[in-house]
Amino acid sequence: MGLHYEHQVHLLKDILTDHQLDCCGTVAEYEQLERVIKSLMANTELDSNFKNVLEDVYRYSQSGISSKSIDSHIQEHQNSLSQWVEQMDSYS
């Protein structure tokens, strides 16, 4: 059974908030971000600004997966993490 839109957005925000607060994460979390974003992007009725945020988070997750230091990668994106969560709040 798949997650509904609201649950998917909530999951994204949870992972991003955890990254921001804990300054650490896992490859599995980045992969989860990618899967959820792909599912959300399949919705043709999404606001174009929200799609832009999702694309930014998708790029973040892709670069995180290939990063030599996940913790450093998360640290480098602290400002973006909080911004993305705030933007998701405004679209959800």
Curated annotation (Swiss-Prot):
Superkingdom of the source species: Bacteria
Pfam families found in the cross-reference section: YtzH
The protein's name in its UniProt record: Uncharacterized protein YtzH
